[in-house]
Amino acid sequence: MEAVKEAVRKIKSLVIPHADEKDNGIVFEIKLNETDQRVEKWGLDPSLDFFEVTGNCNLGRPNSEGSNQSLMGSVTIRNIFNPKLDDLLSKIEYVRFLEAVKKPRNRTFKTSFFNSRKLSPVFTGGPGYEDLVPPMFVGRDCLKATITENLTRQRELTYGVMFEEIITRDENRRISENGLLLSPDGGISINGPPTTLSGTGIDHIATLQANITRDNTKLVNGAVVGEKNIFQVDQGLGIGNNFPLFNRHQLSLTSFIQLKQVEEGSDKPQPPVLVLHGRYGGCIGDLPSYDVFALGGPNSVRGYSMGELGAAKNILELGAEIRIPVKNTHVYAFAEHGNDLGSSKDVKGNPTGLYRKMGHGSSYGLGVKLGMVRAEYTVRHNRGTGALFLRFGERY
């Protein structure tokens, strides 16, 4: 019997579930370790659309032949029951450690080529207009190179350059130059906001990127305590269609405040924690609409769909959450607010105004953590209605 239990434990250690917060699903990875350091993974990701299942395959050679470099590749099919060529997502990544692990400023060089295709949160309708705005998809083919440095044990700096081809398409996979809007007679108006800087539906952009993270959080009986701050800058180089010169910057500050001292130990209860969060984002110059800040969504203002509150060049988000331990988990209450600071009208074509979005909104609610899942009842202040949501992972 003990042998069976040990075998089950070993199998569980090879099955790695984790949340896919971008596509609202769960990824189950199965890891196979071989003696020559090859890694192979495959998984299925059931999305919230129960008729669509994503399949993925990962191959790689970490620390190839002891040379401190690795090559990884992955292929993802958006729907394994109805595969299509333009739904095929791929990523190739090469990583090389530039310094020995024992050195205090360990540098890592990483270069990758990848593509993505996502629903744009900018070209969506506000309350009452959800069904009047056909979806718009943003596809990207990207080549990216970065260097990551550990400045200290708590500070990490990443900087690099990225080249992108961006194509916007409608739900019929046709290249679309403008956002769409259904007219009362059932027809489609194509005189919406422009989807790209070039006005053709296709952009080519080169960007310098840098971000610095300060993270001094720690675990106290399983509860996160401390601070995590992130500052990120994206600088357009003027290379590409219409010579795009822009600066996009954002600062995120999150504090996890321990409200009560507790004895630390594996079987000891978690302390109550107050989480305070703030995020500011700003843009200067010719930023394309697909890269402006979208207000609303599980990682912006909970209770609203992604982009439901607006798309803006400048935003401010504030949030607070108090976590109270209950046995092996915790319950929590939260409140959040997002505001476009009056900058929605500065986005080309003003999609926030055209699609009847508010430009600001608040929410509050209660939740309980159930393993990896958060069950939340959220009240959307703008609508005066509430709903139950299931989310994966942590909000902060």
Curated annotation (Swiss-Prot):
PANTHER family: BACTERIAL SURFACE ANTIGEN (D15) DOMAIN-CONTAINING PROTEIN (PTHR12815:SF42), SORTING AND ASSEMBLY MACHINERY SAMM50 PROTEIN FAMILY MEMBER (PTHR12815). Pfam families: Omp85. Residues 33-87, 149-156, 281-292, 371-384 are cytoplasmic. Coiled coil: none annotated. Mediates the insertion of proteins targeted to the outer membrane of chloroplasts. Required for the import of protein precursors into chloroplasts. Forms the voltage-dependent preprotein translocation channels (hydrophilic beta barrel) of the TOC complex in the chloroplastic outer membrane. Required for etioplast formation and/or etioplast-chloroplast transition during deetiolation. Its main location: plastid. It is a multi-pass membrane protein. Transmembrane regions consist mainly of membrane-spanning sided beta-sheets, which are not predicted by sequence analysis tools. Belongs to the TOC75 family. The chain crosses the membrane at residues 24-32, 88-96, 141-148, 157-164, 272-280, 293-301, 364-370, 385-392. Expressed ubiquitously at low levels. GO terms for biological process: etioplast organization; protein targeting to chloroplast; protein transport. This is Protein TOC75-4, chloroplastic. It is found in: Plastid, Chloroplast outer membrane. Residues 1-23, 97-140, 165-271, 302-363, 393-396 are chloroplast intermembrane. Keywords: Chloroplast, Membrane, Plastid, Plastid outer membrane, Protein transport, Transmembrane, Transmembrane beta strand, Transport. It comes from Arabidopsis thaliana. GO terms for cellular component: chloroplast outer membrane. Part of the TOC core complex that includes a protein for the specific recognition of transit peptides surrounded by a ring composed of four proteins forming translocation channels, and four to five GTP-binding proteins providing energy. This core complex can interact with components of the TIC complex to form a larger import complex. Chloroplastic protein precursors also interacts with these complexes.
